[in-house]
A protein has these predicted regions:
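Acidic, Ser/Thr/Gly/Pro-rich intrinsically disordered interaction regions
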Residues: 1-52, 56-59, 77-92, 100-236
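Charged, low-complexity interaction regions
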Residues: 73-75
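Short N-terminal edge-element motif at the start of the domain
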Residues: 64-67
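Conserved helix-loop functional segments at active or binding sites
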Residues: 70
Length: 236
């Protein structure tokens, strides 16, 4: 963990602190000049969530990993509950990181000195990476952000984040596969082994399977923050 001056809290080591700091300075140079406008309220609230949710996602994933390493596959219902709760928290907070960043970028882009996009109450409710990409396409200084949002929207990693979040939020837990054997030792258990559901694929892998999802998340946030700084242009 390391200290983040913007949030005044500790954040995971791989959180893009430097890119966030640069992005916030660039945004302030636009949104607070000559005075604080309505865009700042929406922007400030969303940017606070980026780091908070990233830390929460990382902490919940660490809880799952520690539980697996300490207890292995054969656990009681109470421990299974704790694991499923940790996965739910990981995916809910991880998706929130990206959605909060997207909302903050839309609020920034709505400023007359940036891209002057419409960001009324309806658009605030509808905001998503794909919609923001469409709203800013063709705007000056928005090329990098359009490219990063396009990469995000077509990413298989992002699809997995969304699908698992939605499954656990609205439909069911991820069904854990438990293997046994007759007349011999069961095959080695995997830390992550879940059956397919009506909306999610089967998953089987070791802990590094979801470690890589956090690597992707940190990299994506970094790219979005850099693109947001570019969007501010000469206002920096």
């Amino acid at each position: 963990m390391r200290y983040c001056p913007e949030y005044c809290i500790e954040v995971p080591d791989d959180f893009p602190v430097e890119e966030l700091t640069t992005f916030m300075a660039a945004a302030r140079s636009v949104l607070l000049q000559p005075e604080k406008g309505p865009e700042w309220r929406e922007f400030a609230g969303a940017t606070n969530l980026i780091g908070w949710r990233y830390r929460a996602s990382t902490e919940d994933w660490t809880i799952y990993k520690d539980c697996w390493l300490q207890n292995g596959p054969a656990v009681n219902h109470e421990t299974l509950y704790r694991r499923q709760r940790a996965l739910f928290g990981m995916f809910t907070s991880g998706v929130s990181c990206v959605e909060s960043a997207t909302y903050a970028l839309a609020a920034l882009a709505s400023h007359p000195g940036v891209a002057s996009i419409r960001f009324d109450s309806q658009r605030q409710r509808d905001c998503s990476p794909a919609r923001l990409r469409n709203w800013i396409e063709g705007k000056p200084k928005a090329q990098n952000l359009v490219e990063q949002l396009s990469k995000l929207c077509t990413s298989e990693d992002w699809k997995l984040w969304i699908d698992l979040r939605n499954r656990m939020s609205h439909r069911s837990n991820l069904p854990t596969i438990v293997r046994g054997a007759v007349g011999g030792a069961p095959p080695p258990a995997k830390a992550l082994e879940f059956a397919a559901t009506s909306s999610t694929p089967p998953l089987a892998g070791d802990l590094d399977l979801f470690d890589t999802l956090h690597v992707w998340l940190a990299s994506t946030l970094k790219s979005l923050l850099i693109a947001g700084t570019d969007l501010c242009g000469d206002g920096r």
